[in-house]
Design a protein with these regions (language model features):
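Structural signal for interior beta-strand "rungs" in well-ordered beta-sheet cores
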Residues: 2-148
Length: 149
């Protein structure tokens, strides 16, 4: 269900049974899988690939350009697996030309205020506690619980 107060670019591919709450912005070249819920005031920028049955809470920003001075607007992505929960005010930056993508695997919980920088690879079944951050180019295996400030 697309709320009339949300903006969804005509070039975005939204599957069935996706709920998009008011004041959310979804840019061009975005794919969102079936059964995903997107809360209010979420921004999903170009290059986002979001799997099935995900929950993205208010204030999250997905697929913003990387915070890397070498970035020259290359076409890169953020790939989020199935059954991922992204809590309030999480930021996930898309990749650079190095890896070309930032990846979050299936069944992950990314708690409030986390930051996952460009070119990171997060495995399946991971939990990031509140305020955890990854600098660019980090790799996190499966079943990792990450905490830190």
């Amino acid at each position: 269900m697309n709320q009339p107060l949300a903006y969804v670019h005509p070039g975005a591919k939204i599957a069935k049974n996706v709920v998009i709450e008011p004041f959310t912005t979804i840019h061009n070249n975005v794919t969102i899988g079936d059964g995903t819920w997107i809360g209010s005031n979420v921004t999903i920028m170009e290059g986002a690939r979001i799997g099935k049955n995900c929950n993205i809470f208010p204030g999250a920003v997905i697929s913003a350009i990387p915070q890397d001075l070498k970035f020259q607007d290359e076409e890169t992505t953020v790939e989020i697996g199935d059954n991922v929960t992204i809590r309030e005010y999480v930021t996930v930056n898309r990749g650079t030309v190095d890896r070309g993508k930032t990846v979050i695997g299936d069944n992950c919980l990314i708690m409030a205020y986390c930051h996952i920088a460009h070119d990171c690879i997060v495995g399946n079944n991971c939990i990031f506690s509140n305020n955890s951050t990854l600098a660019g180019h980090c790799t996190v295996g499966d079943f990792v619980i990450l905490a830190g400030m």
